[in-house]
């Protein structure tokens, strides 16, 4: 009695701050796949490009596993933006001091599924 969880794609170790990518993900959550892709293409943020690549992969996985599906039948069921490791870099400051600059990474997981009404 396991419930089908949809078709998943994950992209890991992307150099983008999770706090900057999450607002982009919240815009397209629970939207039909074609509408979500159209929204992401018109957004100026770097996170929109990263999410759209992962979403294309999830849709491709869905179409490969279920030949009867069409892209118009899919919707974005779930998007998770998780925090990854941080790259530590040195930022030289005045008077011989240095600060640590953290380059944050994120993991993007997109789950698409077939709409229940069809």
Swiss-Prot record:
- What is the name of this protein? Large ribosomal subunit protein uL22
Among its keywords, does the record have Phosphoprotein?
Answer: no
Task: Provide the GO MF annotations for this entry.
Answer: rRNA binding; structural constituent of ribosome
Q: Which GO terms describe its cellular component?
A: cytosolic large ribosomal subunit
* CDD domains in the record: Ribosomal_L22 (cd00336)
Family to which this protein belongs: Belongs to the universal ribosomal protein uL22 family.
InterPro entries attached to this UniProt entry: Ribosomal_uL22, Ribosomal_uL22_bac/chlpt-type, Ribosomal_uL22_bac/org-type, Ribosomal_uL22_CS, Ribosomal_uL22_sf
Q: Respond yes or no to whether keyword Metal-binding is given for this record.
A: no
Function (record text):
This protein binds specifically to 23S rRNA; its binding is stimulated by other ribosomal proteins, e.g. L4, L17, and L20. It is important during the early stages of 50S assembly. It makes multiple contacts with different domains of the 23S rRNA in the assembled 50S subunit and ribosome.
Could you tell me the Gene Ontology terms of the biological process aspect for this record? translation
The positions making up the signal sequence are: none
Name the keywords, alphabetized: Ribonucleoprotein, Ribosomal protein, RNA-binding, rRNA-binding
Q: Which Gene3D superfamilies match?
A: Ribosomal protein L22/L17
What NCBIfam families does the database record attribute to this sequence?
Answer: rplV_bact (TIGR01044)
- Which SUPFAM superfamilies has this protein been placed in? Ribosomal protein L22
Whom does it interact with, and what assembly results?
Part of the 50S ribosomal subunit.
Regions annotated as coiled coil: none
Q: Which organism is it from?
A: Treponema denticola (strain ATCC 35405 / DSM 14222 / CIP 103919 / JCM 8153 / KCTC 15104)
């Amino acid at each position: 009695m396991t419930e089908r969880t949809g078709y998943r794609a994950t992209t890991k170790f992307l150099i983008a701050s999770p706090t900057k990518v999450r607002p982009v993900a919240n815009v397209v959550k629970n939207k039909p796949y074609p509408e979500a892709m159209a929204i992401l293409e018109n957004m100026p943020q770097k996170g929109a490009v990263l999410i759209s690549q992962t979403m294309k992969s999830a849709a491709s996985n869905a179409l490969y596993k279920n030949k009867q599906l069409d892209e118009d039948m899919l919707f974005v069921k779930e998007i998770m933006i998780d925090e990854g490791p941080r790259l530590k870099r040195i930022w030289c400051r005045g008077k011989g001091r240095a600060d640590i600059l953290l380059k944050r990474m994120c993991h993007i997981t997109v789950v698409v599924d077939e709409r229940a009404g069809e």
